[in-house]
Amino acid sequence: MVQHLTAEEIIQYISDAKKSTPIKVYLNGNFEGITYPESFKVFGSEQSKVIFCEADDWKPFYEAYGSQFGDIEIEMDRRNSAIPLKDLTNTNARIEPGAFIREQAIIEDGAVVMMGATINIGAVVGEGTMIDMNATLGGRATTGKNVHVGAGAVLAGVIEPPSASPVIIEDDVLIGANAVILEGVRVGKGAIVAAGAIVTQDVPAGAVVAGTPAKVIKQASEVQDTKKEIVAALRKLND
């Protein structure tokens, strides 16, 4: 199973990162004689521009040239952000629109991350694992291979306090919708976590747990294969 950054490494990374407040500015006006800073990315025509820049760089630019502008619309979706979204260019997985995957998360080959899922810094999505809609992998949460994390489920993150152990999900585990796996819990290979369960203690390999707090109710070997099947076709990428 892939291991990634320690809590201390993540904390140092966030502390050292240059905090960013990127904005997108839509402008109409007279742009004659305007000099744009090198940090600006500028697109558009003679009468209309779209500018990508940092909020702190925009202020002096506007003070210098604001009288030449007409309509202005500014979009800002973060403030002093330390962690950008992950560059997915070389990720060999299926990532659907609306998934939020932060830099320093690992997405292994053949994984699937569905709409609305959130993968925080230091988290690991194992090979062939599916993270369903609106599920959350907190900081350093780690899944093995061929895991299914159901819609709305939460694998709690542990960056603060740094001494806490991360959630570990071993291979071939099924986690039902809206289940919650608390900090430090390890779910053993082939286990099944029922929908809505709150897991506060380690789950033995091959066990089925349910309830609040979750308790072992039977063994995965007693569950019909059709109810615990991981479908390879859903992980298939282009040939």
UniProtKB/Swiss-Prot annotation:
Pathway this chain belongs to: Amino-acid biosynthesis; L-lysine biosynthesis via DAP pathway; LL-2,6-diaminopimelate from (S)-tetrahydrodipicolinate (acetylase route): step 1/3
A Pfam family assignment: DapH_N
EC number: 2.3.1.89
GO BP annotations listed: diaminopimelate biosynthetic process; lysine biosynthetic process via diaminopimelate
SUPFAM superfamilies: Trimeric LpxA-like enzymes
Keyword terms of this UniProt record: Acyltransferase, Amino-acid biosynthesis, Diaminopimelate biosynthesis, Lysine biosynthesis, Repeat, Transferase
UniProt keyword Transferase, yes or no: yes
Catalysed reactions listed for this entry: (S)-2,3,4,5-tetrahydrodipicolinate + acetyl-CoA + H2O = L-2-acetamido-6-oxoheptanedioate + CoA
GO MF annotations in UniProt: tetrahydrodipicolinate N-acetyltransferase activity
Function, as annotated: Catalyzes the transfer of an acetyl group from acetyl-CoA to tetrahydrodipicolinate.
The family this protein is said to belong to: Belongs to the transferase hexapeptide repeat family. DapH subfamily.
Protein name: 2,3,4,5-tetrahydropyridine-2,6-dicarboxylate N-acetyltransferase
Organism: Staphylococcus aureus (strain MRSA252)
Gene name in the database record: dapH
